[in-house]
Amino acid sequence: MAVQKNRKTRSKRGMRRSHDALPAAALTEDSNTGEVHRRHHISPDGMYRGRQVISQGDSDDE
């Protein structure tokens, strides 16, 4: 079984963790409505690449 001989320093631990950070999500402004949405995802109003993908039906919460 692999067991380290010496304790790793805070510096080495930090160097190892330097690649663990998640990149910020790429955001794009919609040209039609001006809303901000994630790249390659449907905008909140149901549009994707200039087309209405999901129809916005009237949602009566009863």
From Swiss-Prot:
Any single GO BP term: translation
One MF term in the entry's GO annotations: structural constituent of ribosome
InterPro entries: Ribosomal_bL32, Ribosomal_bL32_bact, Ribosomal_zn-bd
Composition bias type Polar residues, residue spans: 53-62
SUPFAM superfamilies xrefs: Zn-binding ribosomal proteins (SSF57829)
Keywords, alphabetical: Ribonucleoprotein, Ribosomal protein
Classification via Pfam families: Ribosomal_L32p (PF01783)
UniProt feature, compositional bias: Basic residues: 1-16
Sequence segments annotated as region (Disordered): 1-62
GO cellular component: large ribosomal subunit
Family: Belongs to the bacterial ribosomal protein bL32 family.
NCBIfam families the UniProt entry points to: rpmF_bact (TIGR01031)
Record-linked HAMAP family: Ribosomal_bL32 (MF_00340)
Record protein name field: Large ribosomal subunit protein bL32
Organism this protein belongs to: Alcanivorax borkumensis (strain ATCC 700651 / DSM 11573 / NCIMB 13689 / SK2)
